[in-house]
Amino acid sequence: MYKASANILIACSFLWLTACSSAGVVTEDLIPTDYVNPFIGASTSVGAAGVYHGLGKTFPGATTPYGMVQVSPNTITGGDNSSGYSDEHKTIEGFAFTQMSGVGWFGDLGNFLVMPTTGELQKIAGKEDGSIKGYRSSYDKATETAKAGYYSVELTDYKIKVESSATPHCGILQFTFPSNEQSRIQIDLARRVGGTSTSQYVKVLDDYTIQGWMKCTPDGGGWGNGEGNSDYTVYYYAQFSKPLSNYGFWSADIPDEWVRKPDEVVSIPYLTRISQAPVIKDKKELEGKHLGFFTEFPTKEGEQVEMKVGISFVDMEGAANNFKQEIASKNFAQVKQEASDLWNKELSRIRISGGTDDEKTVFYTSLYHTMIDPRIYTDVDGRYIGGDKKVHEQDGTFTKRTIFSGWDVFRSQFPLQAMINPRLVSDALNSLITMADQSRREYYERWELLNSYSGCMIGNPALSVLADAYMKGIRTYDVEKAYQYAVNTSAKFGNDSLGYTPEPLSISYTLEYAYADWCVAQLAKALGKEEDAKRFYEKGQAYRNMFDAEKGWFRPRNADGSWKAWPENALTEEWYGCIESNAYQQGWFVPHDVPGMVELMGGKEEVIANLTNLFDHTPSDMLWNDYYNHANEPVHFVPFLFNQLDVPWYTQKWTRYICKNAYANKVEGIVGNEDVGQMSAWYILAASGIHPSCPGNTRMEITSPVFDKVEFNLDSQYHQGKVFTIIAHNNNTNNLYIQKALLNGKEYNKCYLDFAEIAAGGTLELFMGDKPNTEWGVLSNI
């Protein structure tokens, strides 16, 4: 949609059809892509977020569902700007063909940066603040357009319109040039988000085609400023619609001793060295440390030039084959339409009715963001780079995928996918299992990027995803091997030596490890491994070792058993025993043993009062804060605790409040990093009226839906039913409390569903009112 009118949807752009269901609720036959606004979350701004993490960090460019390629504008290189784009920036430095979505820790990818220019050749992008000039261009915000599978903008410095679209393995750029004798397409082959590729190669194959590669190692920064251990090579096969009659290279001689990390590659000495690089025009191929390529040509007013690119992480032959199979014979309009069709098909896994246009846009954009990762990592022929850095070929049982942001996505993203796309969950698990196998590490990584064991964040989140999948009937992988690797993971990273994990970050580590061990216990019990189940259930109780009865709360503990000093603001002091949170937020993370947690905390009434205080002190803008901090993951289960405390109306109240205040149809519409689908998946589930409270069991909490009707299309390979529907009668912004419920036409008085009831298909009807019904859903859970 046009950003200038992002809150407006043109009614005539789709057909409204109505059909009365048996429950008397109108069904809308809408087109999901009409409600996707890729600008939501597309900001890294620290100022707008009020915290170093920034906002959503999503990208607005074109991609396909779970595609390998993302063709997106980039406005900044260096720093912690993982998407390469931030809406408040006034200039664009180019259009990359790979991007990460919604993450921190410097990010990575952003490779193969293409920029159309005119006039004198510039070899550096320059700086966003204008202090150093280069080929970057200002752009007209009013012309910036983004839809599912399409992006366009006008570069005002060059008077060039740029449009992008994508197939799963390829991207396409269409440039509309002005009349100019020196028009140009130039490519920065060294560019990489959060750093640089460390070596590159380019070869001119014929009058229209180039191919090559860009090698990215930790020495060039990237993921975690190099600490994330990302080590990959991007291969490309690029074809231009105009002949390469006047082309050239530039190659900067970077001294071996120079540091090439995010800050250094945008420093004045580094940029000076690149700007002084000689132009080379007498060769067909070149390899170097910092290469660029350009092709120049005259253009007429309004002349369109296309550039198509195939991408592979395997080899140059793979990039060429991806190109030939997916995009060689297609023009821009065809690629754009096919991308839109792919998105409509995937987004139709959930159908909604009711809500405002803005709420529909938040919903379908959220669903869109959950369908970026885990992305495909195989070429069209099934080949991929494995955990041993060798070429493998998938056997047809699964699709190899990459980007597993475990600490984030086990909470909502994978439970959502277990409902609407269980094959994706199976793919992700098979990908983690094969990586552990091929690398010979035989344990699960908590944050995987392109086969890297990055060690990012904490806990053992893959154990949660595995247990949750198994308990929900997703078992299309080597179960015994998967289980053994789970046991190995717990042994390598856990609370075994002391019964807790000592400082630093002892609260977070201990509680997260305890939950993961409970997940292994669930698996062991289901597999008939009774001794293992008993042992891991006991390990799941390790959270108790971090609770200081004198203080009445979880407290950091040292290796010698002593407690860390208790400051005056112990509960709300960020990093006091906790990662990216405080003890007041992290301390609620005992999802696998809520009764035990409540007992430690002084009983149900005490806990309800404490939870109420947590929410009452939360700022209305929901930005980063010391209380209910929805901008980060540790609290994402907390609103659903009220269901288990026999006050489900508080779950209903606060989830509706969060949906309204933490999400919006605007750039700043995600209050924290989107985190590879997690923030979006939370909204989709909560706004639909259900959400897990403890992945690894099959309980799904019922809450107050934003929408009048939500239909989840199920997968017949994994589920017995075809559709599970949630209907909210008499639903509006005031009537947010559930008065009664029917499940498949029969009275239902539980505030939760079992996943089997969802998988069987059927209908949950909720009857809403403006006051809490303090009798519905009260089952003395504790």
Placement of each model-derived feature along the sequence:
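C-terminal motif of bacterial Sec signal peptides marking the signal peptidase cleavage site
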Residues: 18-19
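Accessory carbohydrate-recognition regions in carbohydrate-active enzymes
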Residues: 25-414, 418-464, 470-511, 524-545, ...
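Bacterial N-terminal signal peptides that target proteins for export
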Residues: 1-9
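ATP-dependent phospho-/nucleotidyl transfer catalytic cores
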Residues: 516
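Hydrophobic helical h-region of N-terminal Sec-dependent signal peptides
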Residues: 10-15
